[in-house]
Amino acid sequence: MTTTLLTGARVWDGLADAARDGVDVLVEDGRITRVEHRIEAPPGAEVIDLPGHTLTPGFMDCHTHVTVFPQITSALISSPTAQALQALPVLRDLLHAGFTTIRDLMTADPAYSTLDLRDAVARGVVDGPRMLVAPHLISARGGHGDFSGTIGDQFQGPGRPLELAAADGPDEIRTRVREEIRAGADWVKFGATGGFSSPSDDPEQVTYSEQEMTALVEAARDLGIPVTPHCYGDEGVRRAVTAGVRSIEHGNLAGPGALRMIEDAGIFLVPTQYTVLNHADHAFDAEYWATSPAFKQRKFQKYQRQLLETAEHLAASEVRIAFGTDAGMFPHAENWREFPMMVAHGISPVRALRAATSVAAELLGLDDLGVIAPEKTADLIAMPGDPLTDIEVTGEVDLVMKEGTVHRRPAAPSA
């Protein structure tokens, strides 16, 4: 049995308003067994001293794309094997940055490479966060997940349908849902609205009818699988919430009424603010957009004010926010930047940290994670300083423990 004593840090348990001083955490055989003042190290235990650090639960990112990169075209014309190989260092870097759990919400290949990556991590073949996976974005033809119009001229791979997981009408949608679940999906994701990165639609356009959304959610629910939609505007939110989704991805154009509907339904919002609001902040900066498609900049110019207003409304609401980044739309391993973006737009540091720990665990149905308490799985990270007063230190994680195994530790003090 492996035993580790973590001592000398302030401990924030994932729930409280403040961290506690002078508290030690004992980990035995992958689980937290004691959280107390001044624990005496058991014989044979490794002692990790963390002066000046804050110890927290491992972070969870509820919206990643580990096989996708900012220039999505390169992923679309790569083989599933190439995409999986490119994801290996991404997974390692995510873990070393303190993200011990991720929910991956779409690969850009028609196969199921992210399910294979999930299983490889679970078996210990690959170092990385534990993964929950929605393999593809089920999308209406011509919607956000139909890439036919994006790279048709560059398409080279035989048998690589650019429609990926396109489905229209209740019957075809049910079939597509069942195919995802048959392959091993933990979640089902669908496109409720258009998006910013797709050239043929608009973020406020609703791409599935109420009947189609209801058929999709019911097909997944019958098989015990939760559903989440890519969704920006009010009408998409209204239809998705009515259909019975578990969370809303993005929601960055939702007005106060739509946010209240999310709150009243008791579901979660994953606002992916770094990728969206960073673009909005630079909507009229020509240099910032020099290497990006013109249509994408035009969309952010059109919606800049509304995006910033929605962020303000969200901060003032009581919506249950879960942390998610849309990483892959920006460089991987910079997921921590979501924290300061949330805080810059009115969300308190403790609410942002809960979003990535206890609230994320609730969304993902992972009761053993997200808090530091006896009998919980030992997913623990530490960073110098105090993220409750300086959120930027979330980018300086230097201790990472997943299931009791230390994957990163602070550098030894120089002599």
Q: Which residue stretches match the model-derived regions?
A:
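Active-site gating loops and adjacent loop-to-helix segments of metal-dependent hydrolytic enzymes
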Residues: 67-83, 95, 141-162, 194-210, ...
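Histidine/acidic-residue-rich catalytic or RNA/ligand-binding cores of hydrolases
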Residues: 70-73, 114-115, 144-145, 198-199, ...
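Divalent metal-dependent hydrolysis catalytic cores, especially in the metallo-beta-lactamase
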Residues: 88-113, 127-137, 185-198, 226, ...
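Histidine/acidic residue-rich metal-binding segments in metalloenzymes
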Residues: 116, 168-269, 286-290, 300-320
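His/Asp/Glu-enriched, well-ordered alpha-helical/loop segment
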Residues: 222, 226, 287-295, 301-386
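Metal-associated gating/positioning segment near the N- to mid-region
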Residues: 53-125, 141-145, 211, 235, ...
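N-terminal metal-binding scaffold of metallo-dependent hydrolase/deaminase domains
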Residues: 1-43, 55, 385-392, 405-406
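C-terminal cap of metal-dependent C-N hydrolases
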Residues: 9, 356-358, 362, 374-415
